Regions:
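ATP-lid-like helix-loop hinge signature
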Residues: 103-146, 214
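Flexible, glycine-/charge-rich segments associated with ATP-binding catalytic modules
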Residues: 42, 149-151, 164-251
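Amphipathic alpha-helical interaction surfaces in cytosolic regulatory modules
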Residues: 1-41
């Protein structure tokens, strides 16, 4: 939710428009202040997160590895809840690699270099939720521009094509490992969701049979691409949690 809203506000800001937020509850306002979203867009200072569950909102240059590394290290891997989710070094390296591959895709394919990130820890559920997005050329638009055979395909099908092994819009022989590699890394123990232009695509975790759900949204194209993943180390608990948990809006 936070990253999607951030995508919209960045577009409004680039257009030179004035924006304000009205009608949000006090709890939501505090949550969006703790994760640095409201201070980033409206100014002011952040609130202290006494439980340290929040992965703060980040908006930066996808090409700036040092800043992105610092953000991930401080907000994700040095968080005291990281070991509540997983103490597996391979899991940490896998997530870090996947996030950096996503950022690389932003700079290579979307024609913009700005990447937005935010997340939330749910330590009692052994769960991490993280979202990343850009406001550049969408995945479907990028594919139809470079692969003209797909001009009339639904956007969700185009996203699915982009996640398959060996598919790419780049000419290099070594390309085509981007979203497939990311999907393989992130769905071993969690779900992966991609929304781009009119397409919605989600792959459940391999533990939950790895089923793919995809459909097209009606008359609500999203400029750019939004990607969310969850790392669920205790699926028996998380599967019994109501999906309408209000905390889930905060990332």
């Amino acid at each position: 939710m936070t990253v999607l809203l951030g995508m919209l506000l960045r577009e409004v800001k680039k257009a030179g428009k004035i924006y304000m937020l009205n009608g949000i509850t006090d709890d939501v306002s505090k949550a969006l202040t703790r994760n640095n979203f409201l201070p980033y867009f409206l100014g002011g200072t952040t609130l202290t997160d006494n439980y340290n569950n929040t992965i703060q909102f980040y908006c930066g240059d996808a090409r700036d590895d040092s800043s992105l590394n610092k953000y991930l290290d401080e907000q994700v891997f040095r968080n005291n809840h990281w070991n509540d989710v997983t103490s597996n070094q391979q899991e940490q390296e896998k997530i870090s690699s996947a996030i950096h591959e996503l950022a690389l895709n932003v700079s290579e394919h979307s024609t913009v270099n700005e990447v937005l990130c935010c997340g939330q820890y749910y330590p009692t559920l052994h769960k991490l939720s993280f979202a990343l997005a850009d406001n550049g050329i969408s995945i479907p638009a990028n594919i139809t521009t470079n692969k003209h055979l797909f001009d009339v395909s639904p956007d969700s099908n185009l996203i699915n094509w982009a996640t398959l092994r060996g598919t790419s819009t780049k000419a290099e022989p070594a390309s085509g490992l981007g979203l497939y590699s990311i999907k393989s890394k992130l769905t071993s123990s969690g779900g992966l969701t991609i929304i781009s232009r009119n397409g919605y695509w989600r792959k459940a975790s391999n533990i939950e049979n790895g089923a793919v759900t995809m459909f097209d949204l009606d008359n609500s194209p999203l400029k750019g691409t939004f990607i969310h993943f969850s790392l669920d180390m205790n699926t028996q608990v998380t599967n019994n949690v109501n999906n309408t948990n209000p905390q889930s809006i905060f990332f």
